């Protein structure tokens, strides 16, 4: 289930982590995303220590990547230095079709399967399956 920090890190979020085996942490390639990450990691450690000792970070996903921006590259390098092999190789690039899809009530693959954004998520799916299998 998608549980973004904007939805709160309260009791519901902690319960969801307690019932999970692994989490995937999406991080936007923006400066302030790194600040929110510390709060998420604190909650993760709290749940792992007291409620679900088997909880692991299944992967870290970089989103809204823009190869034209130095900031995107810097954020990826910062995250890579901390998470190392947990960082997915797949990057989710900033893509207009990904932004449009929710306003049409559709996931990216149903909205435009040929878009680069949809292809990024298909690549991520393959990478996740390789890690799990």
Locations of regions flagged by a protein language model:
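P-loop/Walker-type NTP enzyme "switch/lid" segment
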Residues: 1, 51, 55, 101-104
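C-terminal alpha-helix
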Residues: 123-132
